[in-house]
Amino acid sequence: MSWYDALWEDAPDPLPGFDVERRRAFLLEHVRGGERVLDLGCGEGDFAAAAAQAGAADVLGVDIAAEAVRRARARHPDLRFERVDDALPAEDASFDLVWCSEVLEHVLDTATLLSEARRVLRTGGLLLVTTPGHALPRRLGLALRGWERHFDPRGADLRFYTARSLRALLEDFGFEEIGVRGTGPHLFASARRAGLRARPR
C-alpha cells in the first residue's frame, strides 16, 4: 500500500472540508460552459462535480490514491475518475482548465505534477491552485498551537508555500499571468499556460 493510500485508509468518510466554500467559489469563478476541466488530485470528487454542474462539457478527476478514486466514483457515478501515478491519462493540450486544490503541499515530486499539468493544458489554458499559506500570521498561529503537531514527519503535508514561493514555482514551470492572493489560511493562485493563443476572457 502506498503512503497516499495509507492516508486515505485512515481518513473519515466523507473527508471534512477546509475552506470548501471559498475554494468552490474560486473554481466556479473561472469555469466556463463548454470547457474541458481536469481535477488534479480530485479526492472525493466534489469539485469535479461542481465544475460539471457549472456547465463544463467534460470533466475528468484523477488521484494517486485508489481509495480516493473509489469514494469519488461512489459519490458521483456519472463522472469519470481515474487513478494515476505520474503521467496523466490525457493528450497534450486537451484541457481548458486544470484545478489543483490542496494537493501541492502533499506532493514530493512537484516537478512531474506541474509539468504534466502544463502539458495537458491548451495554450492559454488556466491552472488554478489552492494550498495552505505559510506567511507570518500562519507561522505565528502554528507557534502558539504547537509546531510539532503541524510538522509531524508522519503527517500529510510535505511542502509549505508562501505567496512568493508559490508564484516562483509556477513561473519556473512555464506559467504566466500569475496571480496569488491569500484568503483566510489559504493561498489561491491562477496562472496561464504560456503561449501565443490566450484563453478567451
Predicted feature residues:
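Conserved N-terminal segment of class I S-adenosyl-L-methionine
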Residues: M1-E91, L97, L114, V129, ...
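Short conserved AdoMet
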Residues: R32, L108, R122
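Short N-terminal helix/helix-N-cap motif within the alpha/beta-hydrolase-1
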Residues: E67, L108-T112, R139
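Acidic/polar helix N-cap motif
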Residues: E91-D92, D109
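A short beta-strand submotif of the Rossmann-like class I SAM-dependent methyltransferase core
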Residues: C100-V103
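Residue-level signal for the nucleotide or nucleotide-sugar donor/cofactor binding architecture
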Residues: E105-L108, Y161
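Conserved class I S-adenosyl-L-methionine
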Residues: L128-H150
